[in-house]
Amino acid sequence: MTDQTTRLPIRRALISVSDKTGILEFARELEALGVEILSTGGTFKLLQDNGVAAVEVADYTGFAEMMDGRVKTLHPKIHGGILGRRGIDDAIMNEHGIKPIDLVAVNLYPFEATVSKPGCDLPTAIENIDIGGPTMVRSAAKNHKDVAIVVNAGDYGQVLESLKAGGLTYAQRFDLMLKAFEHTAAYDGMIANYLGGVDQTADTLSTEGRSQFPRTFNTQFVKAQEMRYGENPHQSAAFYVEAKPAEVGIATATQLQGKELSFNNVADTDAALECVKSFVKPACVIVKHANPCGVAVCPDDEGGIRQAYELAYATDSESAFGGIIAFNRELDAATAKAIVERQFVEVIIAPSVSAEARSIIASKANVRLLTSGQWSERLPAWDYKRVNGGLLVQSRDIGMITEADLKVVTQRAPTEHEMHDLIFAWKVAKYVKSNAIVYARNRQTIGVGAGQMSRVNSARIAAIKAEHAGLQVQGAVMASDAFFPFRDGIDNAAKVGISAVIQPGGSMRDNEVIAAADEAGIAMVFTGMRHFRH
């Protein structure tokens, strides 16, 4: 058994990096600690130009770089020095003049950045597949008992601290080894994903029109948190996040206070935050079991999120109990006070939180308070759905509509006020489990029908919710996430007083549905876009 606390001194290091962030400072500190440095190509030149003593690998091996740099470090004096087992291979190393290399600092050719550039062709991509780098990384990782492998610039500081304390412990080297294999696994996964999308049916292999979906699907997530349990207490769970999230979300949020997030907290907070991102004006979204139960937008900044919260809460105060609340503006003291004095809440998330609001929420120690940071444009990404023995992969639903995208299909067009409410209700319906029906007035939900097998029943539930909350349906608008297959959905809407409807259209019986709306004097618009959510 290896002693976890035994420290490994570093006498010789090999440095060869594409990303040179922090490498000059790291090398200077190593030099100051008496470490001999071997280096290659651009890294060697950077060190030399800045007065850091280093030996070029070609001078050390006696073998010049060749094949336009394809062969630099693939040499027994390099890999023997990395893979040589101290105390076992010493004699053979001495016989061949191989010096032990105790630390390897390597990161790889920027394959992902290269293939992301417009116009990148297959030969360019191939030339940016690193060979020597991963080979050194894997060699050093395999021999982590005797060698430290550093692939992340973020680790330079802790490595130097340990060296100043006498060396790296085995536990530290093991952790660095794990990071190294994670690094090479992600790198190879990127290459396989890219090449797996190449059109192999063409006479000449081409990346033009390459498939979005490679032959094997490789992606990497990093464990952020182990949880007490999963969706239910008998299930184990953990939360994994993308290594480099491209967009603000629950995966990048910062928790300011409260109990540890549960599995359901994460899922519900994601639903609330993604919904509230849809709105430009001050907005509040309250979610329960991944469904919005109350959403409202304040038409001006004067009322702000306090007014939006009051209206969202009024939609369904019963369901709001123990829910998740998301805002698209900084959480202020007045809104925080209104929440803690009125209801039990699991999670509150906002782009930022004022000092006064944070102090108020602190009186409820169990409330989980999160900041998301401010978001910008929604970016394309993948959505995943696990099935038994497989994985469904699709592009994320970031489809949005504006008034210009809508097609008025009835004799009566919506009024300006109705149009604003229709677009609001449509944005909400996108985040409601199918079949989804949303009733809204004055950019406030007044009833949400979610997750029913029958669209008509979802509409009935929305009406029941509105009645129970004491909110008037007469004159409200209705949004449906998918088309109405029969006219009964519109007939029921007319009975409760709905004045305008927004839906995708596309049913075989659209003409019957439109006729039902015309008979009732209901204005109806088609979006041409469906928002199923399962």
From Swiss-Prot:
GO CC terms: cytosol
Keyword Transferase: yes
GO molecular function: IMP cyclohydrolase activity; phosphoribosylaminoimidazolecarboxamide formyltransferase activity
Source species, domain of life: Bacteria
Pfam families listed in its UniProt record: AICARFT_IMPCHas, MGS
Ranges in a coiled coil: none
Record has Cell membrane as a keyword: no
PROSITE patterns assigned: MGS
Entry EC no(s): 2.1.2.3, 3.5.4.10
InterPro entries named among the record's database cross-references: AICAR_Tfase_dup_dom_sf, Cytidine_deaminase-like, MGS-like_dom, MGS-like_dom_sf, PurH-like
Keyword annotations: Hydrolase, Multifunctional enzyme, Purine biosynthesis, Transferase
Catalytic reaction equation(s): (6R)-10-formyltetrahydrofolate + 5-amino-1-(5-phospho-beta-D-ribosyl)imidazole-4-carboxamide = 5-formamido-1-(5-phospho-D-ribosyl)imidazole-4-carboxamide + (6S)-5,6,7,8-tetrahydrofolate; IMP + H2O = 5-formamido-1-(5-phospho-D-ribosyl)imidazole-4-carboxamide
Pathway, per record: Purine metabolism; IMP biosynthesis via de novo pathway; 5-formamido-1-(5-phospho-D-ribosyl)imidazole-4-carboxamide from 5-amino-1-(5-phospho-D-ribosyl)imidazole-4-carboxamide (10-formyl THF route): step 1/1; Purine metabolism; IMP biosynthesis via de novo pathway; IMP from 5-formamido-1-(5-phospho-D-ribosyl)imidazole-4-carboxamide: step 1/1
Domain MGS-like intervals: 6-151
Biological processes annotated in GO: 'de novo' IMP biosynthetic process
Record comment regarding domains: The IMP cyclohydrolase activity resides in the N-terminal region.
Stated family: Belongs to the PurH family.
HAMAP family documented for this protein: PurH
Name of this chain's protein: Bifunctional purine biosynthesis protein PurH
Origin species: Pseudomonas syringae pv. tomato (strain ATCC BAA-871 / DC3000)
Organism lineage: Bacteria, Pseudomonadati, Pseudomonadota, Gammaproteobacteria, Pseudomonadales
Gene that encodes it: purH
